[in-house]
Amino acid sequence: MLDKPWPGADLTKAPKVSRLPDIVTVAQMQRIVDATRVLSYRVFFFTLYSMGLRLGEGLQLRVGDIDADRMRVHVRDAKGNRDRLVPLPARTLEVLREFWKVHRNPVLLFPSRQKGLEGALGATAHMDRGGVQQALRQVTAQIGLKKELPRIA
């Protein structure tokens, strides 16, 4: 300060501590999926885990983003507002097709649950972020899973 030397001010900055998030194992994810009673949440959790998506990425998915021929999904406005292509596992495609037969929304892959799955056909908004987070917290508490789930919760 004031262009004057500071005697004894040879300070070293403390290193940043970065903690890695807990990783959910396949067995733990299977317990989460099995314990989730609401079909749309069950399919959503399975989809996020199997494709490595973030919560917002999964909510924004549209029917047209699924490329079944090339077995990939177009994720729009991912982290950093970039698009990316994600591999689509065959089992996930099967689950998504079965789920779509239930709601039949022509645009949204995970339509709002506000009017139930019967009203999902005409839904113009995706599932509620807070509802998904609350459902996951309830399921993980129910099965006794103590891990922090960074991509979902």
Segment roles from a protein language model:
Residues 1-153:
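Conserved catalytic core of the tyrosine transesterase superfamily
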